Amino acid sequence: MLPAALHPDSLWRPLEQLVLPPIIRDWMADPDSLTRRLKRYGHFSVVPGLHAIALPRADERRLLSLPVRRAALIREVTLHLDDTPVVAARSVLPLTSLAGANRSLGHMGSRSLGLELYNRPICQRDQVWARLASTDQHHSLCWGRQSRFIKRGAPLLVAEYFLPALWEKLHVARCVQASWLHDKAYLYASIRGEPTDAVRLSRF
């Protein structure tokens, strides 16, 4: 399952407005294929989860300019390194975006959607948005990013959550964990509607 947002008011915010630890920003702001990058660190695999025609969430609908009752293909997967889940991903593909040469995007199975997006013709990518999410009942935190892609003129939305196991794999887990107290301060300021530009997340 994808991480659940800690609070419905913990909204997506433009990535460039956030002060993040360098290692997290490096991954969140990387414009290239996440799949290709992950493959450098071990055996990569995609484990499919939800794959259904359903109504997008309100924030997803707004970013895709979809009518309120317009369904889309929702796909949720986890990306694994050496059989360990390191990224949870959710894609929202309007049915009108799955026509013609884009039809294969709706039948990815255990293949990486990211690799397909970066195959020719290479997709266009809009602004990157970010937010915090919880990963389990203990409220372990992770950062997620969301981007809108345009493939052959058709829009789709991809959200990726970087799970704690990724930082363990990169041997930087201790540094990332040290930043969570500051990250929580940012999140709770967001929930309360307080200014977040004064909440500086830790650096390392």
UniProtKB/Swiss-Prot annotation:
Claim: Lyase is one of the keywords in the record: yes
Biological or metabolic pathway of the protein: Cofactor biosynthesis; ubiquinone biosynthesis
Q: Which EC number applies?
A: 4.1.3.40
Task: Give the catalysed reaction(s), semicolon-separated.
Answer: chorismate = 4-hydroxybenzoate + pyruvate
Query: How is this protein annotated for GO cellular component?
Result: cytosol
InterPro entries in UniProt: Chorismate--pyruvate_lyase, Chorismate_lyase_/UTRA_dom_sf
- GO biological process terms, semicolon-separated: pyruvate biosynthetic process; ubiquinone biosynthetic process
The answer, when asked if Lyase is one of the entry's keywords, is yes
Where it sits in the cell: the answer is:
Cytoplasm
Q: Which GO terms describe its molecular function?
A: chorismate lyase activity
Chief site of localization: cytoplasm
Q: Which keywords does this chain's UniProt record carry?
A: Cytoplasm, Lyase, Pyruvate, Ubiquinone biosynthesis
Q: Which SUPFAM superfamilies does this UniProt record tie to the protein? A: Chorismate lyase-like
Positions bound to substrate: R75, L113, E160
Similarity comment? Belongs to the UbiC family.
Functional description taken from the UniProt entry: Removes the pyruvyl group from chorismate, with concomitant aromatization of the ring, to provide 4-hydroxybenzoate (4HB) for the ubiquinone pathway.
State the name under which the record lists this protein. Answer: Probable chorismate pyruvate-lyase
Organism of derivation: Alcanivorax borkumensis (strain ATCC 700651 / DSM 11573 / NCIMB 13689 / SK2)
